[in-house]
Swiss-Prot record:
PANTHER family: 50S RIBOSOMAL PROTEIN L31, CHLOROPLASTIC, LARGE RIBOSOMAL SUBUNIT PROTEIN BL31C
Record keyword Ribosomal protein present: yes
Family: Belongs to the bacterial ribosomal protein bL31 family. Type A subfamily.
UniProt name for this protein: Large ribosomal subunit protein bL31
InterPro entries the UniProt entry points to: Ribosomal_bL28/bL31-like_sf, Ribosomal_bL31, Ribosomal_bL31_A, Ribosomal_bL31_sf
PROSITE patterns associated with the record: RIBOSOMAL_L31
One Gene Ontology biological process: translation
Region (Disordered) location: 67-88
Length: 88
């Protein structure tokens, strides 16, 4: 037999909330569960693609340490190889 009064309170109709809107109910130990993404707005399930506003780690590293962006570094390498090929 399980010990009495040691288990958390069970809420059989806990509300799952996404962007201020109740999207579903489920059983949980919390009365409300706030989520950022669920199957109704996830790009995989909706078939849409969102463009995120985050920059890549390499770009951030290059900018942080004063090396310019990745595009600048590759274009500098190309121009250097073009100049050496023109000299010969």
């Amino acid at each position: 037999m399980p010990k009495p009064d040691i288990h958390p309170t069970w809420y059989p109709d806990a509300k799952v909330i996404c962007n201020g809107e109740v999207v579903m109910t489920t059983g949980s130990t919390q009365p409300e569960i706030n989520v950022d993404v669920w199957s109704g707005n996830h790009p995989f399930f909706t078939g849409t693609q969102k463009i995120l506003d985050t920059e890549g780690r390499v770009d951030r590293f290059m900018r942080k340490y004063g090396m310019g962006s990745v595009d600048n570094a590759t274009s500098e390498k190309k121009s250097a190889t073009d100049e050496t090929s023109k000299e010969s």
